[in-house]
């Protein structure tokens, strides 16, 4: 893909994932239609089960391709949670759906594969302690166990990233450990909050 963030690459449809590297080498964005279009496309602006089904099928297809190593990463667009529910999907959003697909791929029970959502760029990485729950539930989710799990997941990921970035550290130089800041629930969190 082009290095310039402002340059939009040309979108090129591909029939198979194997065509993607050649298309990308020509500074184009390879796009594979993951699931067939229905005879009638869902109407814009209307919440429909058909749209939810197409979104779920597309995410499932792309996630499985990524888990198989056919893709380096998965980028998802916003999905409508109500349309997902109308399509019969039990997940409130992407994160839970991707967690279930990853657990299925590894043969791990979903409960044994906790995940968190990270918003990241080169300057800042932010990990959410909870998602897709009400404010009351989010406040209740701020427990020592939940926070430690979030910090542990984040630490493992960042340590792996730092190790990758410093592939061959100089002799006698320790690998840098991730430093993680934890924001309080409200500004005076340390004042009996």
Residue ranges and their predicted role:
Residues 73, 113-116, 124-125:
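Generic beta-strand structural signal
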Residues 1-96, 149-193:
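Contiguous, glycine/small-aliphatic-enriched amphipathic segments in soluble metabolic enzymes
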Residues 22-26, 118-123:
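Short glycine/proline-enriched loop/turn "hinge" motifs that connect secondary-structure elements
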Residues 96-113, 133-160:
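Active-site glycine-rich loop that binds ribose-phosphate moieties when present
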Residues 13, 33, 117-120, 128:
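Structural signal for conserved beta-strand scaffold positions within catalytic alpha/beta enzyme cores
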Residues 119-127, 180-184:
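Mobile beta-alpha loop/short-helix "lid" or hinge segments that flank ligand
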Residues 77-80, 126-134:
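Acidic/polar active-site rim loop that often engages polyanionic ligands
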Residues 90-92, 110, 118:
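Active-site loop-to-helix "anion-binding N-cap" substructures in soluble metabolic enzymes
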């Amino acid at each position: 893909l082009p290095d310039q963030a402002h340059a939009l690459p040309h979108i090129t449809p591909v029939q198979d994932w194997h065509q993607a590297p050649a298309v990308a080498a020509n500074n184009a964005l390879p796009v594979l239609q993951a699931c067939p279009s229905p005879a009638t496309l869902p109407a814009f602006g209307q919440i429909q089960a058909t749209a939810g089904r197409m979104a779920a099928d597309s995410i499932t297809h792309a996630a499985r391709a990524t888990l198989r190593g056919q893709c380096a990463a998965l980028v998802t667009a916003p999905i409508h949670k109500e349309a997902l529910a109308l399509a019969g999907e039990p997940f409130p959003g992407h994160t839970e759906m991707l967690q279930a697909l990853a657990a299925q791929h590894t043969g791990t029970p979903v409960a044994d594969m906790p995940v968190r959502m990270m918003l990241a760029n080169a300057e800042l990485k932010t990990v959410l302690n909870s998602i897709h729950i009400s404010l009351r539930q989010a406040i209740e989710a701020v427990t020592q166990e939940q926070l430690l799990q979030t910090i542990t997941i984040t630490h493992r990921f960042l340590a792996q990233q730092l190790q990758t970035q410093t592939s061959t550290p100089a002799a006698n130089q320790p690998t840098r450990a991730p430093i993680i800041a934890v924001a309080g629930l409200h500004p005076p969190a340390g004042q009996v909050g």
